[in-house]
Amino acid sequence: LCSREGEFCYKLRKCCAGFYCKAFVLHCYRN
């Protein structure tokens, strides 16, 4: 299970390939 662009990310739910977890807002953004 992974988060896509604009979705919440945290320790147990990483971002999908091609995305990164932006600090503080904890949302996935496109690389």
Swiss-Prot record:
It is found in: Secreted. Disulfide bonds join 2-16, 9-21, 15-28. Its main location: secreted. GO terms for cellular component: extracellular region. The keyword Ion transport does not apply. The keyword Secreted applies. Probable ion channel inhibitor. Belongs to the neurotoxin 10 (Hwtx-1) family. Expressed by the venom gland. One of its GO terms (molecular function) is ion channel regulator activity. Keywords: Disulfide bond, Ion channel impairing toxin, Knottin, Secreted, Toxin. It comes from the Eukaryota. This is Jingzhaotoxin F7-15.33. The presence of a 'disulfide through disulfide knot' structurally defines this protein as a knottin.
